[in-house]
Amino acid sequence: MMVDSRLLVSDRINGTTNKMNGALDHSDQPDPDAIKMFVGQIPRSWSEKELKDLFEPYGAVYQINVLRDRSQNPPQSKGCCFVTFYTRKAALEAQNALHNIKTLPGMHHPIQMKPADSEKSNAVEDRKLFIGMVSKKCNENDIRVMFSPFGQIEECRILRGPDGLSRGCAFVTFSTRAMAQNAIKAMHQSQTMEGCSSPIVVKFADTQKDKEQRRLQQQLAQQMQQLNTATWGNLTGLGALTPQYLALLQQATSSSNLGAFSGIQQMAGMNALQLQNLATLAAAAAAAQTSATTTNANPLSTTTSALGALTSPVAASTANSSAGAAMNSLTSLGTLQGLAGATVGLNNINALAGTVNIAQMLSGMAALNGGLGATGLTNGTAGTMDALTQAYSGIQQYAAAALPTLYSQSLLQQQSAAGSQKEGPEGANLFIYHLPQEFGDQDILQMFMPFGNVISAKVFIDKQTNLSKCFGFVSYDNPVSAQAAIQAMNGFQIGMKRLKVQLKRSKNDSKPY
């Protein structure tokens, strides 16, 4: 109530409080240091006019923006708004008088008023400059003299080593961000100081968010490097496996019914990871042999032959007799190119439907994804089938690790997927939870590209705050790649977060018919 009485006094003295806060002197634009304020706990029935009447006692209002729910017709207020005063002083006075103090009619809680996220209350990090390529002969006073023409300097510090000597860089904090921006425009690369090899560098100092984002990106890069290294190590270490295991695996993949999987129980002593490696070896051996024996052939035919080898008993027999030779030949560039060709073929699997019995292959994989419950299979056999599912998607991971040049070309082809919301076929669309807030479309694209051809990658952004909602969608052009991504990335830890990756629910799931 003291605030209200003070305002009444100022009205009598000055005619209006607006005059006290510079409203009569303002220009068409707010002051450079003006603050955009977020205001919550306002009645949903209030319009901009009523809000203006609430705020104008503290100073002239430049802009009021009521947040509305556009999904309703007509759009309804969300009970909050943004307000920008012409002067910084007016905004702070309004905050001091209203925040957690005044409760508006019909509301149960007092007004919440604070600088918008974009303003950060004129935080130091928004006004702090990094000065690089500074002469080591300069001290703090020299830096102050150099930058004082641009405004009031709150702090000036030269970075020094343990010996007390200058490291050739400094930090300068101005009173306002506008002053700092003017200093950057005028001083950046404007001169080369004594003892320096390059012109002076003047830019905003890294914020804590910048540092955290850089740390997360480095951590993700290291983890993906380890993943690729481990994956390629698994492939190259399979040469010692016997042809008998390969024959059994080929027989399993060449069958269109689940009865053929009974023979896999002979491998009961092997864990799921070893079985997955077996599947990958079979695919790699078939692709390698096809590459070695086919010359001047159409790439589509080559890939068709490689895929046919995965389902053909004849190819299985050939792979059994020459598995060791195929693995040794993987070290040659020609063979690796054949492996990459097989990968491209998998990405265009629909184009081969008329040549290879793809339906037979995919029907078995579809059974792996949920139709096995009624067959009475043991956990070990189910794990084996799960490993076989990855055989067709695993090749791409190994090709990426072994062929960084070819893989980078694939990367360029998929760049357009970042930010788009194009959906793939049924079972090829993923929902990713618990993404770091710093992650954007490009980050999620790079993270999920090793598992297949990504046709879209999108991180969802809050339209009001312009910040990530920490979830997104990734779509592949085939369900096999999506399954491989789920198995590799579900539970993958980035910083303090552990990703949750699952299939996007079908639109038909909610329909009762």
Swiss-Prot record:
<dbReference type="GO" id="GO:0003723">
    <property type="term" value="F:RNA binding"/>
</dbReference>
<dbReference type="InterPro" id="IPR035979">
    <property type="entry name" value="RBD_domain_sf"/>
</dbReference>
<comment type="similarity">
    <text>Belongs to the CELF/BRUNOL family.</text>
</comment>
<dbReference type="InterPro" id="IPR034198">
    <property type="entry name" value="CELF1/2_RRM2"/>
</dbReference>
<dbReference type="InterPro" id="IPR002343">
    <property type="entry name" value="Hud_Sxl_RNA"/>
</dbReference>
<keyword id="KW-0507">mRNA processing</keyword>
<dbReference type="GO" id="GO:0005737">
    <property type="term" value="C:cytoplasm"/>
</dbReference>
<dbReference type="GO" id="GO:1990904">
    <property type="term" value="C:ribonucleoprotein complex"/>
</dbReference>
<comment type="function">
    <text>RNA-binding protein implicated in the regulation of several post-transcriptional events. May be involved in pre-mRNA alternative splicing, mRNA translation repression and stability.</text>
</comment>
<keyword id="KW-0539">Nucleus</keyword>
<keyword id="KW-0677">Repeat</keyword>
<dbReference type="InterPro" id="IPR034196">
    <property type="entry name" value="CELF1/2_RRM1"/>
</dbReference>
<dbReference type="InterPro" id="IPR034199">
    <property type="entry name" value="CELF1/2_RRM3"/>
</dbReference>
<feature type="domain" description="RRM 3">
    <location>
        <begin position="428"/>
        <end position="506"/>
    </location>
</feature>
<dbReference type="GO" id="GO:0005634">
    <property type="term" value="C:nucleus"/>
</dbReference>
<keyword id="KW-0678">Repressor</keyword>
<keyword id="KW-0694">RNA-binding</keyword>
<dbReference type="Pfam" id="PF00076">
    <property type="entry name" value="RRM_1"/>
</dbReference>
<dbReference type="InterPro" id="IPR012677">
    <property type="entry name" value="Nucleotide-bd_a/b_plait_sf"/>
</dbReference>
<protein>
    <recommendedName>
        <fullName>CUGBP Elav-like family member 2</fullName>
    </recommendedName>
</protein>
<dbReference type="GO" id="GO:0006397">
    <property type="term" value="P:mRNA processing"/>
</dbReference>
<feature type="domain" description="RRM 1">
    <location>
        <begin position="35"/>
        <end position="118"/>
    </location>
</feature>
<dbReference type="InterPro" id="IPR000504">
    <property type="entry name" value="RRM_dom"/>
</dbReference>
<keyword id="KW-0963">Cytoplasm</keyword>
<feature type="domain" description="RRM 2">
    <location>
        <begin position="127"/>
        <end position="207"/>
    </location>
</feature>
